[in-house]
Amino acid sequence: MKAAMQYQNKTPEEIVRQYKKRLRAKQGLIILILLLHIIINIRGIWWGDDGMADVLLKLLILIAVTFPINVWISWDFMSLNLILNQNCDPVTYVQVLCLLEKVHKRKRSAVAIRINEAAGLMWSGQFSDALALAEPLRKYKLSVNYQISLLNIRFNCYKKMEDLERAMQVKHEAEVLVSSFKKASLQRTGQELLNVMDASLALWRGDHETYRRMEEARSARYTAKLQKVVSVVCLADVDIACGELKNAKTHLEYAIQEGGTLYVVEDTRRMLAELTQKEQG
């Protein structure tokens, strides 16, 4: 993906510097438009040319002009997720987000940064640190997408730390949240989260056939490289358990090649070494 390439082979400082440069340019453009709007309105009111209808019309025009710029700013922020999702580099991702805390000081932005940082820490294998960041964020009023992200982070971290009781508590929280959704689109998103949790628990219990069936059905829809890498590592685990060593080796080699700094790569190297030993033995 071309957009993800812009973050490759760059230090966190370079990425944030470029991000700030683009952000300041867009913010400057908004300020310029606002000043122009104020000057035109003052002139119109002062000379008595503008009535209330004219003022409201100009306000609507202002909103229409600045809205795409605000969307552009939001897109720039969201595009940083490509460092994690496409470049599979949670280490750089976390460092970038730490630097961004000094750029975005508004509460809403700070909470979004911390949730994303917790995800980066999780994919770096720093599960206790991710939980330390994620748990306090539950007290905030979050968008549905961020609520789902937070539930996913907490569930995965507790499961990886083998705290099944807390993982199941998080799953119950997810079920309660999903049951409250009215919109069909939110219900689908919520159900997908529950399916991911069910599949993960099936793998954890050693129910390999159930996991394979669920994961193969989902993996056809994966677009992010991170999803593909994590999927093939889990499927390799299933392949090994089922004696399908050739498939397992193919999956593991792909994960090592594409997995970047994801914590699963370390597990993958260990699994591949054990598999090679089996073949030689």
Model-derived features: positions:
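Cytosolic juxtamembrane N-terminal segments of multi-pass membrane proteins
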Residues: 1-23
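Transmembrane alpha-helices and immediately adjacent membrane-cytoplasm interface residues
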Residues: 54-85
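Canonical alpha-helical transmembrane segments of integral membrane proteins
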Residues: 26-44
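Hydrophobic/aromatic side-chain positions at a characteristic register within alpha-helices
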Residues: 72, 84-88, 122, 159, ...
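Solenoid-like repeat scaffolds
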Residues: 64-70, 98-108, 135-144, 172-188, ...
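Helix-turn-helix repeat elements of alpha-solenoid scaffolds
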Residues: 53-55, 82-98, 121-135, 163-176, ...
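Long, non-transmembrane cytosolic or organellar matrix-exposed soluble domains/tails
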Residues: 207, 211-281
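"A position-specific structural signal for the A-helix of alpha-solenoid helical repeats
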Residues: 78-79, 109-116, 146-156, 160, ...
